[in-house]
Design a protein with these regions (language model features):
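PRPP-associated nucleotide enzymes
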Residues: 1-144
Length: 144
């Protein structure tokens, strides 16, 4: 197995997570509740970290949810959420993934929210590669 290149150390990663959490809080400080939805696998871990920071800096109730998607063939399988539509209805939803590359995964995952009335849908990524082939953008991103 080839050796993986380490992009961020633990402290650098936490700095990026802290900044993302603060940005989300700053734009949603008037909300009483935020739903943070992580895309399996690494998006879920990032969502949990961001949620933990938001909870530590504010009184906003943060609900962490997950969505499972086949990233290689998203159109061939259904998305699997661990929340129902009524759990996210009329709330701020923050969709989280580790990397925005072509935009296919985030486009497919975000399409599920189009039939649900939301206060707002935002997208968060740790890395934005800017190779977009789909009309989707990250509202919050940390360039590495």
């Amino acid at each position: 197995m080839p050796k993986r290149t380490k992009i961020l150390d633990k402290n650098q990663l936490q700095q990026k997570v802290n900044r993302l959490a603060w940005q989300i809080y700053e734009r949603n400080h008037m909300e009483s509740e935020i739903v943070v939805v992580g895309i399996q696998n690494r998006g879920v871990e990032l969502a949990k970290r961001i949620s933990k920071v938001i909870s530590s800096i504010s009184d906003i109730k943060v609900i962490v949810a997950t969505v499972s998607i086949d990233k290689d063939n998203p159109y061939d399988s259904d998305l699997v959420f661990n929340l129902t539509e009524t759990d996210i209805e009329n709330k701020v939803v923050v969709l989280v993934d580790d990397v925005l590359n072509s935009g296919k995964t985030l486009m497919y995952a975000s399409s599920e929210f189009l039939t649900v009335p939301l206060v707002k849908l935002s997208i968060v990524v740790l890395v934005n590669r800017n190779h977009n082939r789909y009309p989707i953008k990250a509202d919050y991103a940390k360039e590495i």
